[in-house]
Amino acid sequence: LWNRLYAALYMRTTDDGQSYGQDDLDPFLWPSSTYLLTEPRHGQILALLNEFLDKRGDNLIAQPLKRAFFQNDLWAIFDWLADPDAEHVEKKARFIAERQALRNRLAPIIRRLALSNEQIETLPDTYRVALASGAYPARQNPAHTEKAFLPRDLFDGHGPWVHFQNGDGKPHPFAKPTALTHVHFAGGRSTFFVFMNLPGGRQTTLDYMQKVNAFPATSGPQGRLLTSSSGALPAPSGTQFAIVRQMMLIDDKGKMRPTRLIESVQIRVVRGNMEKESDFYEFTQHRKELFDGKGLRAVKSDEVTIPVFNVRDEDVLDLPRSVRQKREAAVKGEGRVTENLRIGCTSCHTQSGIASVSSFFHDRPPGLTASERGPEVERVIRWKGEKFNWGLLQGLATEPRH
């Protein structure tokens, strides 16, 4: 039943037979998507949700890790269905009832799948599992930059990697989540931690952060460019940045809780002053491997994915193959609508050097502050707590409504 419901909600097939959604961090849903709301799939999903509720499908699997993943999967679908903007778009008005029907059934299932806080704390530390495998070196090999590395000291609060917040470390609402664009894309169902590591050690990185804070604010759309090209703030060659995505869950008391499930790690190593000279690496979780006791897996340099992050476009999987090919040809000169990590990163982080780190420039001065990860988690929880979809989920989670 779990597998059937997951497939109905997540699996997508294009007109040329390509399948997507088997094991991805996020559903292939865009604001304009309708595949959950139209027949025959809508009716199939309703039937599966009713079966899950009537037969107490939440009792079929007791393993906390699988319950955690499934709750997070359903939470993502609920949030998309609860988008307050969607019901005010004229062409989608006919889907209001369909959205409500799915939401009303998903909410109590999400609540039934909830783990206790004690169970959440026992979920595996997937980063540590990946380190223990010994599959990846701890440092970049300059002679083999094509090989991914996974720092062993990334989370060491006294090591060379500095986790930082912007906004002088103030809590929300006085400061927004540091990686706000990423948090917004993930709907607050994940926390994102941003790290920096300059050659020379932790103190060198801390000193550099203070230089960024003290640099005179510039105005206008070229503010970042002027800041970086002035020569005052070049990130030294060898500077490393990392952004870590960590799964959030809802516990059995209806509260958001962080986990030790690391969903992805993206690392960028600056070589020279131009973005094209940087090295990019990504690790992502894969649930089948994780259920077998394994951790994160490196994304291959030629591996491609559907562009979902920060893309507000029509549902590309519904487009005819010929249209997808033409669109992709205009960008990459080849067929399917896919992108690799490097293209995905540089589409937003277009500037060179320090100006490419968007978290530095939410505010000027940015108020960069070395921080433990706990305060950033609290920022995200408070940010999410203000959202319409969170309030709606809380209101619907008690009893199924048909």
Task: Describe the role of every protein-language-model region.
Residues 1-19, 257-402:
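Sequence context surrounding c-type heme c attachment/ligation sites in exported
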Residues 1-227, 232-235, 239, 352-402:
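Long, charged, low-complexity terminal extensions
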Residues 196, 209, 241-243, 265-268, ...:
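Generic structural hydrophobic/aromatic packing signal, biased to beta-strands
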Residues 214, 229-275:
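Glycine-rich, aromatic-lined ligand/substrate-binding cores of catalytic
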Residues 220-222, 243-247, 325:
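A short linear-motif detector with a strong N-terminal bias
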Residues 226, 252, 330-333:
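Sparse, context-dependent recognition of short Cys/His-centered cofactor- or disulfide-binding micro-motifs
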